[in-house]
Amino acid sequence: MQTETFVVPKFYTDEFMEKHEGKFFSSKGIKIFKDNVDIFDEQGKPICKFRKNVLTPEECQCLFQLNGAAKLGKTRPSASGIPPEGKYKYIISKSTGKKLHVLTTQSRSGIVGFWDTLSNFGHKHDKHAKDSKKPKCRTTAYTGTHLEQYKDCLPVFQKINKIFKELVPKQYSKQKKAIGLIDSQFIIPKTIFTTVTVNKNFRTALHKDSGDCKEGFGNLVVASCGNYTGGYTLFPQYQFGIDCRNGDFLAMDVHTWHCNSELNGDGTRISFVFYLREKMQKTCPKQVNVLDQ
């Protein structure tokens, strides 16, 4: 399939986009791409590269079995939408008694792989959390309880890593350098990813991703079941969107404003975003043997 290339100007100012963080956008009037395409801004910086049907039905089914990671919870600040009362509210942790700043909105989103902290909303996952010699990262809860499913999908993760390298080699090279600074036990084997965010029928509001490698790139694939329409990945500032469906791959600059259009129908759309948690370079640095220095 031939790949088209487009250069797109900004339709909205940066100030306009910042004011609309956490708001939902419609796909009405926006150009939706449904076939292979590379899209750049006017400075030549890649916004996204989209490829159809890169995963086999069997690979999609393997990923789909991880959909349980996307539990209903309060974990995505701007992406879940910002209500009039604001992103956060205060609660008292039942386990620590501390005052916590938590989200006001819920979404079906979770994580697979590894995370850059031992705690999650006030709950400690390691009794040695205060030990300065212990790594400050952990296997995610879902990965730990579904280890065989995770291992079964490693070849798919590694294939996605390979496509990342082929599509955006410059960003891949920078992310590879960054992951070389992280303890290998917290890296998804034979990839330059530490973490996968799993979203289930999640219409995200306008946001930029945070916590990932700033010089890298986001890698999104979709595994779905049943029929649905919409759910486009929108880039409102540039007035275009991508219809990423079952087996498709979208390499994207996740630090560009983006969101999703409304999803209609009774089908299930699971999106998987592969990335590197930048904080791990400090919390879980690569262990260097003094004999190697």
List the predicted regions and their residue ranges.
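Fe(II)/2-oxoglutarate oxygenase catalytic core
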Residues: 1-217, 242, 261-270, 276-293
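Residue-level detector of short, conserved catalytic/binding motifs and their immediate flanks
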Residues: 217-219, 231, 248, 270
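Retroviral integrase
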Residues: 219, 223, 250-253
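A short beta-strand-loop-beta hairpin characteristic of the jelly-roll/cupin
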Residues: 223-245
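Short, solvent-exposed loop/turn segments at secondary-structure junctions
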Residues: 226-228, 240, 256-257, 277-279
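Generic beta-strand/beta-sheet core signal
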Residues: 236, 252-253, 275
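Conserved metal-binding segment of the jelly-roll/cupin
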Residues: 242-257
